[in-house]
Design a protein with these regions (language model features):
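Peripheral, non-AAA+ core regions of ATP-driven protein-machinery
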Residues: 1-214, 218-224, 261, 326, ...
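Basic, amphipathic alpha-helical bundle interface domains used for macromolecular binding and assembly
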Residues: 41-46, 61, 68-78, 284-285, ...
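Short loop/turn elements that form and flank the Walker-type P-loop nucleotide-binding site
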Residues: 60-63, 100-101, 131, 150-151, ...
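P-loop NTPase nucleotide-binding/switch module
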Residues: 168-205, 209, 237-290
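Walker A/P-loop
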Residues: 214-255, 320
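The Walker A (P-loop) glycine that initiates the GxxxxGKT/S ATP-binding motif of P-loop NTPases
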Residues: 217, 280, 302
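Walker B catalytic acidic pair
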Residues: 295, 301-303, 313
Length: 506
């Protein structure tokens, strides 16, 4: 048999399209030709596969070899095609006799010794193979990842010889051990934060409803400390969420996907991060920070120091929960459903009023002008974190609640939302808000008048209603009351600050 066909999977974002490896041996001058839009890393497979076959006790065919990676229009990169190419060569040269090739897919890089190495994107490949009705063989380096899927459709091996013996019916391959769904509770606790009761209340609301939060305050008041406590208030990842997050992480960091797959992601990029680093990029786009924060938290400290175009690029993903990256060689969609938490100083000197203020209203407004209005509109809550009052440090943390206590209320509020609308309040669409966020007529009139006075947009009105709905859920109340709306309005610090500065300049 001079022709062999082996199935494998490409890595194209979180998708894994089927790739057919076709190998044909013919008479002629010995040589190897590889077609099907392979990258340089794929072309290097000829040397790796040759050495792996020889060191595994097989002969490299001394014939004219043509290898086709179909379909030809899909770009291919990386060493993930080594194992299927080696198997196809062995079958085509009749060194391996098997009739079971069409029942399996193979993904793995080969060492020169014939050992198997892990590849990025093993989870999407395994899920797509199972969906197609085939089993998949991967390296034991990827065992922890594909073990998240469970079942016996994923098999692991350490060496090319093991795979060949399995296909010949001489031995069996074992499935990966399924990971125990244990929670990782190593989160920082709210008890560490002294004072800042309104900030803690805002964190509870944000955790319960999935809202975005902007923290404004002078340096050293605990903005970053508060933000880092949010993951400890959130529920653990569900099985589906864990798979989604692990699939994204496996594209860029194998170690993280193995060891931290149950933790909600908490990404805190530096303010010098580029547009490509934040939203994703490359000739074949890789996920950026917003996708790595999927199902978790994206924390942006020193918000005005980020490039404006980087921040404005976040506007669409915040609304849609995904990012579409178009490049000349590939167009890829990545999920990006994250909670945005940001922190900033109110002025370039850190203060905008009081004895510490050294900036004029014009300088402060120019500083805040780095943030576009549409971007600020994406925050459901904005809160001022003031300097602690005198005496608070000597009192310690008396009567403070732990993250575990607050988390119980958060879980109860989330359960109410799931029973009512099967999604968090922050993700409610306009038509759903009519049923879930109903107001009494007098409250609706009062809210509209208040928004007109503050000069807020319709988007801000929608976000206010969602926050009020979450406050009502935390209070275990069915209808939104006036005091829920008043508390939601109290979390509009950025609007009050801008109005105050404009009055000072008038």
């Amino acid at each position: 048999m001079s022709l062999a066909i082996v199935y494998t999977r490409a890595a194209l974002g979180i998708e894994a399209p089927l790739i057919t490896v076709e190998v044909h041996l013919s008479n002629g001058l010995p040589g190897l030709t590889m077609v099907g839009l392979p990258e340089t890393t794929v072309k290097e497979a000829r040397d790796r596969v040759r050495s792996a076959l020889i060191n595994s006790g097989y002969a490299f065919p001394a014939k004219k070899i043509t290898i086709n990676l179909a379909p030809a229009d899909l770009p291919k990169e990386g060493g993930r095609y080594d194992l299927p190419i080696a198997l196809a060569l062995l079958v085509a040269s009749e060194q391996l006799n098997t009739t079971r090739l069409n029942q399996y897919e193979f993904v793995g890089e080969l060492a020169l010794t014939g050992g198997l190495r892990g590849v990025p994107g093993a989870i999407p490949s395994a899920m797509e193979a199972i969906k197609a009705g085939r089993r998949i063989v991967v390296s034991s380096d990827n065992a922890a990842e594909v073990g998240l899927i469970g079942g016996s459709d994923c098999l692991v091996a350490d060496h090319l010889q093991e795979v060949c013996a399995f296909l010949a019916g001489q031995t069996s391959l074992s499935p990966p051990l399924a990971e125990a769904p244990a929670r990782d509770e190593r989160y920082e606790d709210l008890l560490d934060v002294i004072g800042q009761q309104q900030g803690k209340r805002a964190l509870e609301i944000v955790a319960a409803g999935g809202h975005n939060l902007l923290l404004i305050g002078p340096p050293g008041t605990g903005k970053t400390m508060l933000a880092s406590r949010l993951p400890g208030l959130l529920p653990p990842l569900s099985n589906q969420e864990a798979l989604e997050s692990a699939a994204i992480q496996s594209l860029v960091n194998l170690h993280t996907a193995k060891t931290r797959w149950r933790q909600r992601p908490f990404r805190a990029p530096h303010h010098s991060a580029s547009l490509a680093a934040m939203v994703g990029g490359g000739s074949i786009p890789v996920p950026g920070e917003i996708s790595l924060a999927h199902n978790g938290v994206l924390f942006l400290d020193e918000l005005p120091e980020f490039e404006r175009r980087v921040l404005d690029a976040l506007r669409e993903p915040i609304e849609s929960g995904k990012i579409h990256i178009s490049r000349s060689r590939a167009k890829i969609d990545y999920p990006a459903r994250f909670q945005l938490i940001a922190a900033m100083n109110p002025s370039p000197t850190g203060h905008y009023q009081g004895k510490h203020n050294r900036a004029s209203p014009e300088q402060t407004l120019r500083y805040l002008g780095r943030l576009s209005g549409p971007f600020l509109d994406r925050f459901d809550l904005s809160l001022e974190i003031p300097l602690p009052p005198p005496g608070i440090l000597s009192q310690g943390s008396q009567g403070e609640e732990s993250s575990a206590t607050v988390r119980q209320r958060v879980l109860a509020a989330r359960e109410r939302q799931m029973l009512r609308q099967n999604k968090l309040n922050a993700h409610l669409e306009n038509r759903e808000m009519k049923n879930c966020c109903r107001l009494r007529r007098e409250d609706a009139v009062w809210l509209e008048q208040t928004l007109t006075q503050l000069g807020l947009s319709i988007r801000a009105w929608q976000r206010l209603l969602k926050v009020a709905r979450t406050i009502a859920d935390l209070a275990e109340v069915e209808e939104i009351e006036r005091y829920h709306l008043q508390e939601a309005l109290s979390y509009r610090a950025i609007d009050r600050m801008l109005n105050h500065l404009q009055k000072m300049m008038a």
